[in-house]
């Protein structure tokens, strides 16, 4: 896809793990970012859509109507709900943007990327396996642990000072 072919995504999908236990964890930064978008753009409350394995809301960014979707599958099975969502709405993969945590970026840093590998992220691995890789991603940095205990790090809550990703905003142009 060349820069002249890139169009604004129609669906923003936040990755995370369902349940109170994981609220506020680094791994749930995708959910959190969607909540911030919904609040900023006055979107209705997310409504559970069991047939899609997730919760859905609608918003308007700069006059563009978009869907906001939170997968209710655990991170490692995210591809199942994304596949179902794409099939249900008959979407091409390049119309979605996956929002996820990224250990390789400093906390509070965000990067937009189109296509590519999973970079060790099991949620992306699941999506790429079941759907392909030609989608947008907003990678939100959560920093890297000082130890090799990555699982406990991403499933834990960051310190208050580290939660600078709450001030990120969505670019209006890709």
Label the predicted regions.
Residues 2-114, 125, 129, 134-136, ...:
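Nucleotide and nucleotide-moiety/phosphate-recognizing core
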Residues 71, 142, 157-160:
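Active-site donor-binding loop signature of nucleotide-sugar glycosyltransferases
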Residues 111-117, 154-158:
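Short glycine-enriched, charge-decorated loop/helix-capping segments at active-site entrances
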Residues 120-123:
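Hydrophobic alpha-helical segments within soluble ligand-binding/sensing domains
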Residues 137-145, 154:
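Glycine-rich anion-binding loop/nest that anchors nucleotide
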Residues 148-164:
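Short, electropositive alpha-helical surface patch
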Residues 166-174:
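Conserved small/polar residues in nucleotide/adenosyl-binding loops
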